[in-house]
Amino acid sequence: MDSNTVSSFQDILMRMSKMQLGSSSEDLNGMITQFESLKLYRDSLGEAVMRMGDLHSLQNRNGKWREQLSQKFEEIRWLIEEVRHRLKITENSFEQITFMQALQLLLEVEQEIRTFSFQLI
């Protein structure tokens, strides 16, 4: 994982945590939690690719691993839709920029997870 992606995650999480979206702050906190979870999952998948010795243990747990991967892709799709929705309804330029960058980051992370998972299959 490159350092730009790490700093992008940290930057977006910090900016999202500063936003005050009124009654939807619980939803925003949920999005932040999912972003953090997604980052950890992506990082662990990347580490597994780097240590190909883990490939054997992953294959032994293949059913569970595939189910978890599928769940993560569902989370990514939900987050993408949620971020797109927020982009449509917000008029604040700071929020628009933050959500645009979050959307771009989600698409990058989805691609990275796909790449890692294909290497592990």
From Swiss-Prot:
Motif Nuclear export signal: chain residues: 12-21, 85-94
Keywords: Host nucleus, Host-virus interaction, Transport, Virion
Domain of life of the organism encoding this protein: Viruses
Pfam families, per the entry: Flu_NS2
This protein's record includes keyword Phosphoprotein: no
Biological process according to GO: exit of virus from host cell nucleus through nuclear pore
Protein name, UniProt field: Nuclear export protein
